Amino acid sequence: MADAGARRPFFRRRKTCPFTGSNAPKIDFKDSKLLMRYVSERGKIVPSRITAVSALKQRELARAIKRARFLGLLPYVIR
């Protein structure tokens, strides 16, 4: 009989990119509600290792956030 205290090792599920797939949202600088999910509470762009966004989509996302900031749709700094 196996150890009573032995447990199965925990395997973290690999996150998938939220922007890939058939019904994934498009990255658009006018969609400030979507972009705010990828900006921290201090106004910084959240890295892809935390959000699990692919490298290509992270570049698109950063470009869209910067464009929205320039046009005044998103704040540069949140106090």
From Swiss-Prot:
One of its GO terms (cellular component) is cytosolic small ribosomal subunit. Gene3D superfamilies: Ribosomal protein S18 (4.10.640.10). The keyword rRNA-binding applies. Pfam families: Ribosomal_S18 (PF01084). PROSITE patterns: RIBOSOMAL_S18. It comes from the Bacteria. One of its GO terms (molecular function) is structural constituent of ribosome. GO terms for biological process: translation. Keywords: Ribonucleoprotein, Ribosomal protein, RNA-binding, rRNA-binding. Signal peptide: none annotated. The keyword RNA-binding applies. Belongs to the bacterial ribosomal protein bS18 family. HAMAP family: Ribosomal_bS18 (MF_00270). Binds as a heterodimer with protein bS6 to the central domain of the 16S rRNA, where it helps stabilize the platform of the 30S subunit. Part of the 30S ribosomal subunit. Forms a tight heterodimer with protein bS6. This is Small ribosomal subunit protein bS18. It comes from Afipia carboxidovorans (strain ATCC 49405 / DSM 1227 / KCTC 32145 / OM5). The lineage of its organism: Bacteria, Pseudomonadati, Pseudomonadota, Alphaproteobacteria, Hyphomicrobiales.
